[in-house]
UniProtKB/Swiss-Prot annotation:
Similarity comment: family membership: Belongs to the TrpB family.
Protein name: Tryptophan synthase beta chain
Gene for this chain: trpB
GO CC annotation: cytoplasm
Modified positions (N6-(pyridoxal phosphate)lysine) in chain numbering: K100
Organism of origin: Pyrobaculum arsenaticum (strain DSM 13514 / JCM 11321 / PZ6)
Length: 409
């Protein structure tokens, strides 16, 4: 069992740009102390390479099934016939069906330790909302989730399971908050940026509430490194390419950062390419601008330097709702800027074809988000020499995404 999280800030070849306040208005940086547990703020700005995982969180990891398996995609290899070996880390075995639980458990623990009785968050496809709902239940907290309206209407099964875990769920934009009312109309698809604004506003409007972010912030990425730290131990050989999908960056970071850190320190993975795969509907790494921008739609949170499409960008509704985000985490953005991470983007049709192929060859129905990584793996397997090795993170299953598969098939 992993007993430390990895913080890539200690090994970055350039200084990570700090959050900053906008030129006008109250301090957003000061706002963080009102919405986040103090331990998480310390982690966000830490330069320490290793952060100890509290025993209570390690126990929770054991309860939900960590470590997760690393598997070889032998069926997919045979179907492709390229002579490339393919491994995948499978986070879908966790109770909520995705990697999101890794940081939800940690954040719920710190919120409880900080005296919170209620937590609030945003969710796109519902994986993060489910993770927060379960983590809150396990640590005795109430949970409120603002779910992008397009997913609230289409991902009804995840909505049901969030409520099963005890959460209150609102479609976003909602009429519950001023941020929601500003964008509200019944046919608005919502965005993660708007949902973040609603969750933060909700936390600020009450007592003993904390906000739990699902991605983008550095401590979220740090908690997810349990994935990559396990994978480094499990991989029988170093890959020529390590691949994961990107929404805000926590899934990609969780799988690749321990490997990237070793490469930066000269301790291994020298030949490995790190490939970040995003949805064509939200191509922040491939088409965005590297600049300071708000991580939420309304501008409640501090500005961070990242690749962004603009905080007012509303991506079109797609099956991979968890990737419908306008920006990427600061550390991931810096690594992309430095050329250490290679970005790719794919249209929905190509991604769903890859998802179906994987289901028919490996027996696992992948989440549409995770299928973006599979799409890239198929292309890489055709381009790399025989005998090459690819490893990717299968961040979640798609058993609760039947609507996406039904529309595609």
């Amino acid at each position: 069992m992993v007993d430390r999280w990895y913080n890539i800030a200690a090994d970055l070849p350039a200084v990570l740009a700090p959050p900053k306040d906008p030129d006008e208005g109250e301090s957003r940086i000061g706002l963080l102390t009102r919405i986040l547990p103090s331990a998480l703020i310390d982690q966000e700005f830490s330069a320490e390479r290793w952060i100890t995982v509290p025993e209570e969180v390690r126990d929770a990891y054991r309860r939900v099934g960590r470590p997760t398996p690393l598997l070889r995609a032998e069926g997919l290899e045979r179907a492709l016939g390229t002579g490339v070996r393919i491994y995948y880390k499978y986070e879908g075995v966790l109770p909520v069906g995705s990697h999101k639980l890794n940081t939800a458990l940690a954040q719920a623990y710190y919120a409880k330790a900080d005296g919170a009785v209620e937590v609030a968050t945003e969710t796109g496809a519902g994986q993060w909302g489910m993770a927060v709902s379960l983590a809150a239940a396990l640590f005795g907290l109430k949970a409120v989730v603002f779910m992008t309206r397009s997913s609230y209407n289409s991902k009804r099964q995840r909505l049901t399971f969030m409520r099963t875990y005890g959460a209150t769920v609102y479609p976003s934009p909602s009429e519950v908050t001023e941020a929601g009312r500003r964008h509200y109309r019944p046919d608005h698809p919502g965005s993660l940026g708007i949902a973040i604004s609603e969750a933060v506003e909700y936390v600020l409007s009450g007592e003993k509430r904390h906000y739990l972010p699902g991605s983008v912030l550095e401590f979220v990425l740090m908690h997810q490194t349990v994935i990559g730290l396990e994978a480094v131990r499990q991989l029988p050989e170093e890959p020529d390419a390590a691949v994961a999908c990107v929404g805000g960056g926590s899934n990609f970071a969780g799988f690749t950062y321990p490997m990237i850190g070793m490469k930066l320190r000269g301790e291994g993975f020298d030949k490995t390419r790190f490939v970040a795969v995003e949805a064509e509907a939200a191509p922040k790494l491939t088409k965005g601008e590297y600049k300071y921008d708000f991580p939420d739609a309304v501008g409640i949170l501090p500005m961070i330097k990242m690749y962004t499409l603009g905080h007012d960008y509303v991506p079109p509704p797609v099956h991979a709702a968890g990737l419908r985000y306008h920006g990427a985490a600061p550390s991931l953005s810096l690594l992309r800027k430095l050329g250490i991470v290679e970005p790719l983007s794919y249209p929905q049709e190509e991604v769903m074809k890859a998802a179906v192929l994987f289901a028919r060859t490996e027996g696992i129905v992948p989440a549409p988000e995770s299928a973006h990584a599979i799409r890239a793996v198929l292309d890489l397997a055709k381009k790399l020499p025989r005998g090459s090795v690819i490893a990717f993170n299968l961040s979640g299953h798609g058993l609760l995404d039947s609507d996406a598969y039904e529309k595609f098939l």
